[in-house]
């Protein structure tokens, strides 16, 4: 009997250990990787780059980066003032999202002081490229460069280059050149399509005029 009991105990112990390990793996929360974000104070006079994997970590690093002593703050989206107060909503936001930290008594205000009109925006050109250089760590070699290209004010692409070291700089440069080649290819396709439309319109107008003159002569 004792031998059978020892044998049963020897079988149960590994199963119990496996069950505890499986439970630990299943119920341990998933750790999200750290992502780059931009944060600013209420009047946009100070901006910083922050790497964070969770909402709480972002708020904590933002308070340190902007040297804010109070703990009663509200995190909102800089573009429209939407409050970010849940982890689920925070994880749905993309990299390089711009946030604004509001202390007690402060309110979100739009970036421009003029009142927007309902008239459609005027196209100032075919493409616009903006560069945003910032540092996530004071010890970084150069910092991080965010390149954003907007074509026809409809299509927008962005790329984030992290230049924290010499090797990282070369690696990021090669990636940027490859990405630039892809963007240039897309831009040439859009430009070619636009030029074909312009040429087709110019060819159709003379043909319509000649048809109208022919009808007038026959009459």
Swiss-Prot record:
GO terms for biological process: apoptotic process; cellular response to cold; fat cell differentiation; lipid droplet fusion; lipid metabolic process; lipid storage; negative regulation of cold-induced thermogenesis; negative regulation of cytokine production. Its main location: other. Expressed in omental and subcutaneous adipose tissue (at protein level). It is found in: Lipid droplet; Nucleus. Residues 33-110 form the CIDE-N domain. It comes from the Eukaryota. Keywords: Activator, Apoptosis, Lipid droplet, Nucleus, Transcription, Transcription regulation. Lipid transferase that promotes unilocular lipid droplet formation by mediating lipid droplet fusion. Lipid droplet fusion promotes their enlargement, restricting lipolysis and favoring lipid storage. Localizes on the lipid droplet surface, at focal contact sites between lipid droplets, and mediates atypical lipid droplet fusion by promoting directional net neutral lipid transfer from the smaller to larger lipid droplets. The transfer direction may be driven by the internal pressure difference between the contacting lipid droplet pair and occurs at a lower rate than that promoted by CIDEC. This is Lipid transferase CIDEA. The gene is CIDEA.
């Amino acid at each position: 009997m004792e031998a059978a009991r020892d044998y049963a105990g020897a079988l149960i112990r590994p199963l119990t250990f496996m069950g505890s390990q499986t439970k630990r793996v299943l119920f341990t929360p998933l750790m999200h990787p750290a992502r780059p974000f931009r944060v600013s104070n209420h009047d946009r006079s100070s901006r910083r780059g922050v790497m964070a994997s969770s909402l709480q970590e972002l708020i904590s690093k933002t308070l340190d980066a902007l040297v804010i002593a109070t703990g009663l703050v509200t995190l909102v989206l800089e573009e429209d003032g939407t409050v970010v107060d849940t982890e689920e909503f925070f994880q749905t936001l993309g990299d390089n999202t711009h946030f604004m930290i509001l202390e007690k008594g402060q309110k979100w205000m739009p970036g421009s002081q003029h009142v927007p009109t309902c008239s459609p925006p005027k196209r100032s050109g075919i493409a616009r490229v903006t560069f945003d250089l910032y540092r996530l760590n004071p010890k970084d070699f150069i910092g991080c460069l965010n390149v954003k290209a907007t074509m026809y004010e409809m299509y927008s692409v962005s790329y984030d280059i992290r230049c924290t070291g010499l090797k990282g700089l070369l690696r990021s440069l090669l990636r940027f050149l490859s990405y630039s080649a892809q963007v240039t290819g897309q831009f040439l396709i859009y430009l070619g399509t636009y030029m074909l439309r312009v040429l087709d319109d110019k060819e159709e107008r003379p043909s319509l005029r000649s048809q109208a003159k022919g009808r007038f002569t026959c009459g």
